[in-house]
A protein has these predicted regions:
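Beta-strand-loop-alpha "switch" segments that mediate conformational coupling across diverse proteins
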Residues: 199-227
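NTP-binding/hydrolysis catalytic cores, primarily Walker-type P-loop NTPases
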Residues: 222-259
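Walker A/P-loop NTP-binding active-site region of P-loop NTPases
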Residues: 6-71, 120-122
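Short, hinge-like loop/turn segments at secondary-structure boundaries
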Residues: 55-59, 163-164, 190-194, 226-228
Length: 259
């Protein structure tokens, strides 16, 4: 029997906002709450999820493209029980339009496999508005835009939000504020961003949650151990975020842009 799966795409307008850290910690938190979770790292050649988890998947989606591995072999179970799917290791893989199309077809195959066996599939995208980002958002039931308070990051996030809503005005987009000192600061950043999007595209993302700015999070990146395993304040933040995501599960969306 097919599971009722929810696909959440985690995106950002620019790099350096902690998107992959959010994806990894949220995946482990949902798993700890009893959900089966797959984490698809769609950042071709520059994916950080395996590094942050200190895992070394033997196969990637690129191996599936080359017929060197079956879909089940590409699914790697981490020590925390998350199914990790890595797109490709080589940064110069799938750079042409034709190669990207082939990759997206294989990503679709892996996504269907993950959706069939898991309650949640989290897709960690590259930063920006490229083709793989659009592919991942188009396949999602819900999008989560990672925000930080820097003006350039807000501007880049706005460009991505504008692209999303001009493509699909009904797309369910939420925001996660990262690197915030307090809940009040996080709410202020989310509200400021919502004011911008409401003014120019007449839409506003739902504020899903926030992650505190802590030295322990930076340390967890260096030690390749997700902070939710040992830092209570981070555990609390991600547990609240996971609760919002789990309670707000959306019905299946139909893709409207097939590359």
């Amino acid at each position: 029997m097919k599971r009722t799966s929810t696909t959440l795409t985690i995106a950002s307008g620019k790099g350096g906002v902690g998107k992959s850290v959010v994806a990894v910690n949220l995946a482990e938190t949902l798993t700890r709450r009893g959900h089966s979770v797959a984490l698809l790292d769609a950042d071709v050649g520059q994916g950080a999820c395996s590094v942050l988890l200190n895992e070394d998947p033997p196969h990637t989606v690129a191996d599936l493209v080359r017929l060197d591995a079956a879909p089940d072999a590409v699914c790697h179970e981490t020590t925390a029980g998350v199914t990790l799917i890595q797109s490709a290791r080589a940064p110069d893989a799938f750079v042409t339009e034709q190669q990207a199309t082939v990759l997206h077809l294989s990503l679709d195959e892996m996504l269907r496999t993950a959706q069939h066996h898991h309650d949640f599939v989290l897709i960690d995208t590259p930063a920006g508005t490229g083709g793989t980002v659009r592919w991942a958002l188009d396949r999602a039931d819900l999008g989560a835009l990672v925000l930080v308070g820097e003006p350039t990051a807000i501007a880049d996030a706005y460009r991505l939000a504008k692209l999303i809503w001009r493509t699909d005005p009904t797309f369910p987009l939420g925001s996660i504020v990262n690197f915030a000192e307090t809940a009040e600061e996080a709410k202020s950043i989310a509200a400021r961003f919502a004011t911008i999007t409401e003014r120019f595209v007449h839409q506003a993302p739902t504020h899903l949650g926030w992650i505190p700015f802590m030295k322990a999070v930076r340390t967890s990146v260096q030690t390749q151990t997700p902070a939710v395993r040992s830092v209570p304040a981070v555990q609390e933040a991600f547990d609240a975020l996971a609760g919002v995501v789990a309670e707000g599960r959306h019905h299946e969306r139909q893709p409207i842009n097939t590359p």
